[in-house]
Each structure stands twice: as structure tokens, then as C-alpha cells.
């Protein structure tokens, strides 16, 4: 039996923490309540990884058993519990168990070093840790730990259901998610129940997947290749239990050949990933021999998608063309800002769509010729950075994103770069994203990273690290760029190769690492 929660589609303005937000009056209030939807899907497979297949019933029993175990160990409301591990059924069960007892899951990055784990434990004032084998080896010895393992298959049918205590308010902390740290030390973003549930409700609303809009035939297999410890992973967990999705997860880190095998074997219908992952799958030799016809929907985020990427999808996955989707968001706003799908991704390449129903967007400092900083205001935004006094949110509720962008006359948003990444060459501002978009138009370019490097007279010059598939040269790329960008934005330094660029734990190109290595090499060459 599903929880007695009313999900509405009407929107009104409500004062939240002294700020006027657009909200759904009829809404869920606590993420722990969502676990009850597992009963609707019963014996359907919910989590698939390797040889493990966990049904929705298995999940609910295992979560309640784990919640009882944690509560018996003294954990409860407001305790901050570090979950440190790679994607697995145990990760998901531990997350839901923390939510059920009112604890606050602190999502650790499975790729962190020992010192980064120690920093996170200190930053978020972690009470206890739940860690897999790899994660356990990185934990500070003084930190208390609880058992990672979960009794998935052995959960006893006769054990009474776990009875949760009084629910915290919707504006109390629900989860702590760390930023990627690409601009420095990762920040601990505290998201409320309202933050997560408002984002979930908006997505279910626009896709017509609210609980009362779906039937028992809804759902299907979805490939999940991103880390659960990012905001996108949390969104996937919440959505999948509402619509009855089967989460198909690779074992370990992302591998194109394994992704292809899983799509064929589990007849995957949906896949959410960053563009780099999708490109590498479609360019893998096995893509020509695997049956990918069941894949009907691809959602990409983490980087703009251009016409060339959509064309790659058309050729490699012709069945997904009407259902290519993208969007824009960041951890600090619960990952939910804008969305685009279908024809919009074809007719407006480079756009991340229009604002979601409860999201307001404005562009600070924008003029007719200059893009402005993107500011967002919505109920999805964070409460604060844990352990930090500064906040990117103004008194009237506007979140400074640090991204640059603009909106066209039809309300579609375009993200053109990061303010901090702007290359300033002889007084001219150059957005790396715009240069990368132009490079993507060249047929032989597989992927690229554009950044600034020091120049004695101009301050900076433009450098491009480019992966090509057809033996293209720097001279050919330069000629192409002269036709597509201003003369001052044409890269004057090139790194052309055939091996993939390094990626971070989210599967995105690690531009920081590429730029750092290039600058060090240039410095060495100049000596």
C-alpha cells in the first residue's frame, strides 16, 4: 500500500525561512516517507549489480532491518552518518535506513584520499561512519563505525515493521552532499527535506510521473553510471522508488564495454549520464554489435549538449531522438534549475532548457552584449554550507551560481561558462565553453578542454587540449576555428592526441588536471 501523500500540480508563493518561494501546497514533507512506495512495486527488481538482484520488497525489509540495527546502536535524529563507498545495494539500503531513523546521511566520495576523508569527517562533524572495504581503510581510526553489510536476502518476513519516530520538519537537514571541489576544498552542502522533495516533485510533474499519474506498467530498466554520492544519484534514488524503476549499476568504475553489455542484457530503456560517458560508449567498437534498440531515453547533464552530440545520438541510438533530455543545476540548488527535452535539444542546441516550475532565474550584470552571472531562487536550494560562515545566497534568497549565461526571447537558458574560468586575453573575455562548442563542430573532434595559459604580453592566451579520431592536425583545427569564433578566441596553443582526456569521479573531463599538466609542461619548456 502506498503512503497517504497528496502530490499536487498547483503552485503558489509561500514564505519559507523569510523568503518568498514558489511551492506546491500539496507535497510530501520527509524523504523517509517515500520508502513506503516500495510496496507498490513489490517483487519487481529494483537494484541490479553483478549477480545481485534486489526487489522492492527485499529493499524495504532490508532497510527496516538496518534502521532497527542503527537505532539499537544509539543512532537517531540529527546524527550525521558518513556513507563512504562505491555504488552498491548496500549503499542504497544504508542511505534509506539513515533517512528512516531521522539521521542525516553525509555522502562521502568513494574516490577520496585518506586526508580528504579526514577533512570531510571534520568539516561535517560526522558522528559515525558506514563504509565498504575500500572506504574503511581510509577512515580516521578514532571515528566510530557501524556495520556496512545489509541482510538483503535474509530479511525475515515475520519481523514487525520499523516504526519511525516523530518526523522532523521539512526544513530540517535531510542530507549533506559535498561539492566536487573543482574550485578548491569540497564544501559540505546541507540540503533540507524540502530541497530534495521540491526538486523531485517538479521533475515528476513535468514528466507526468507523479504517483497518481502512473500505473503498474510504469517503470523499466534504467542504467545508472554516475556516483550515488552526488546530487544526481540522490535524485535517481528518490525518483526510482516512486515510478518503480529497476536501477542497473555497473560494478566499480565506468567502463564503456560493460555499459553496452548491461544495456543489451537488461533491455535498458533509460540512461542518465554525462556527455563524455555517452560519447565513449557510442564510439566503442562493441556499439556496432550490441543490441541497443531498447534504449529510448537518454538524459545528459554536467556539460552543455551541442548539435554535434545530438547528431551522434541520432546515428548511434536512433530510437532516443525524441527523448534526449538535458538540464542545469548544481549541488547548492538540489541539482534542479532548468530542463529541456525532445525537439528543444535539436532546435536549440547548447540550451539547457527553461526554468522548472518553482525556479526563478535572473542574470546579474548582463547587458545586450555581455552574459551575466546566473542567479537562482527556488525551494530546492541548500540551507547552508556546514561549518562555513559565508553563503552564496543573498538575504532575499538568490543563489549566486558562479556560472555565466543568458536567456533567449522564448525563455530558454544558455550556460556559457564559469566566471572563474573566463580567459582574459589582452582585455578580451573568452568563455572556454564557447570555444569548446566550436571545436565540437569539427567532424574529427571527439572531446576537448579549453583553458587559459600565461602569456608575457597578453596576460593569457587560449590553449585547447583536443582528442581527435581522424588524424586531424593543429593547423587544420586552427583553420576551422577561424571560421567559427572571433580571432582573439582562436587557440594559439594546441595539445592534439588520440587518447581520451582524464575524467573525474563523475565521468566529466577533468579540465583542472589537463590545464595544470599543460601549464607545468609549458613552464618546463620555457626554462
Where are these regions (language model features)?
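Conserved pre-ATP/AMP-binding loop-to-beta segment of ANL
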Residues: 160-178, 184-185, 211-221
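Conserved AMP-binding A3 loop
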Residues: 55-57, 174-202
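AMP-binding/adenylate-forming catalytic domain of the ANL superfamily
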Residues: 486-508, 525-527
Amino acid at each position: 500500500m502506498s503512503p497517504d501523500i497528496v502530490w499536487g500540480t498547483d503552485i503558489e508563493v509561500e514564505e519559507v525561512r523569510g523568503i518568498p518561494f514558489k511551492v506546491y501546497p500539496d507535497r510530501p514533507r520527509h524523504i523517509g516517507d517515500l520508502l513506503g512506495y516500495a510496496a507498490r512495486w513489490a517483487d519487481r527488481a529494483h537494484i541490479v549489480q553483478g549477480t545481485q538482484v534486489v526487489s522492492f520488497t527485499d529493499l524495504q525489509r532490508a532497510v527496516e532491518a538496518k534502521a532497527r540495527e542503527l537505532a539499537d546502536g544509539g543512532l537517531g535524529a540529527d546524527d550525521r552518518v558518513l556513507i563512504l563507498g562505491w555504488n552498491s545495494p548496500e549503499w542504497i539500503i544504508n542511505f534509506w535506513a539513515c533517512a528512516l531513523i531521522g539521521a542525516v546521511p553525509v555522502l562521502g566520495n568513494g574516490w577520496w584520499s585518506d586526508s580528504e576523508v579526514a577533512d570531510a569527517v571534520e568539516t561535517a562533524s560526522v558522528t559515525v561512519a558506514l563504509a565498504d572495504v575500500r572506504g574503511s581503510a581510509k577512515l580516521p581510526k578514532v571515528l566510530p563505525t557501524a556495520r556496512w553489510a545489509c541482510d538483503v536476502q535474509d530479511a525475515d518476513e515475520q519481523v514487525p515493521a520499523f516504526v519511525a519516530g516523530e518526523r522532523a520538519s521539512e526544513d530540517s537537514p535531510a542530507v549533506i552532499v559535498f561539492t566536487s571541489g573543482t574550485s578548491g576544498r569540497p564544501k559540505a552542502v546541507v540540503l533540507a527535506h524540502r530541497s530534495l522533495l521540491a526538486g523531485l516533485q517538479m521533475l515528476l510533474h513535468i514528466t507526468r510521473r507523479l504517483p497518481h499519474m502512473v500505473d503498474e506498467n510504469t517503470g523499466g530498466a534504467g542504467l545508472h553510471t554516475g556516483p550515488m554520492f552526488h546530487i544526481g544519484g540522490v535524485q535517481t534514488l528518490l525518483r526510482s522508488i516512486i515510478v518503480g524503476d529497476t536501477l542497473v549499476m555497473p560494478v566499480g568504475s565506468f567502463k564503456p564495454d560493460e555499459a553496452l553489455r548491461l544495456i543489451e542484457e537488461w533491455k535498458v530503456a533509460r540512461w542518465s549520464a554525462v556527455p563524455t560517458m555517452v560519447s565513449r560508449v557510442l564510439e566503442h567498437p562493441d556499439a556496432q554489435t550490441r543490441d541497443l534498440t531498447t534504449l529510448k531515453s537518454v538524459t545528459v547533464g554536467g556539460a552543455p549538449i551541442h548539435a554535434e552530440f545530438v547528431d551522434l545520438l541520432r546515428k548511434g541510438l536512433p530510437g532516443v531522438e525524441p527523448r534526449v533530455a538535458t538540464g542545469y543545476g548544481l549541488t547548492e540548488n538540489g541539482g534542479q534549475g532548468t530542463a529541456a527535452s525532445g525537439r528543444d535539444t535539436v532546435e536549440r542546441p547548447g540550451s539547457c532548457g527553461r526554468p522548472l516550475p518553482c525556479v526563478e532565474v535572473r542574470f546579474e550584470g548582463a547587458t545586450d552584449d555581455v552574459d551575466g552571472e546566473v542567479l537562482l531562487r527556488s525551494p530546492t536550494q541548500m540551507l547552508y554550507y556546514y561549518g562555513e560562515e559565508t553563503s552564496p545566497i543573498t538575504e532575499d534568497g538568490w543563489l549566486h551560481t558562479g556560472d555565466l549565461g543568458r536567456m533567449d526571447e522564448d525563455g530558454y537558458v544558455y550556460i556559457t561558462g564559469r566566471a572563474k574560468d573566463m580567459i582574459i586575453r589582452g582585455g578580451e573575455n573568452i568563455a572556454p565553453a564557447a570555444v569548446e562548442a566550436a571545436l565540437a563542430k569539427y567532424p574529427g573532434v571527439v572531446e576537448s578542454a579549453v583553458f587559459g595559459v600565461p602569456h608575457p604580453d597578453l596576460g593569457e592566451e587560449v590553449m585547447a587540449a583536443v582528442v581527435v579520431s581522424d588524424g586531424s592536425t593543429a593547423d587544420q583545427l586552427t583553420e576551422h576555428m577561424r571560421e567559427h569564433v572571433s580571432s582573439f578566441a582562436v587557440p594559439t596553443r594546441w595539445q592534439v592526441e588520440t587518447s581520451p582526456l582524464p575524467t573525474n569521479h563523475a565521468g566529466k573531463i577533468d579540465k583542472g588536471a589537463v590545464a595544470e599538466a599543460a601549464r607545468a609542461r609549458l613552464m618546463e619548456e620555457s626554462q
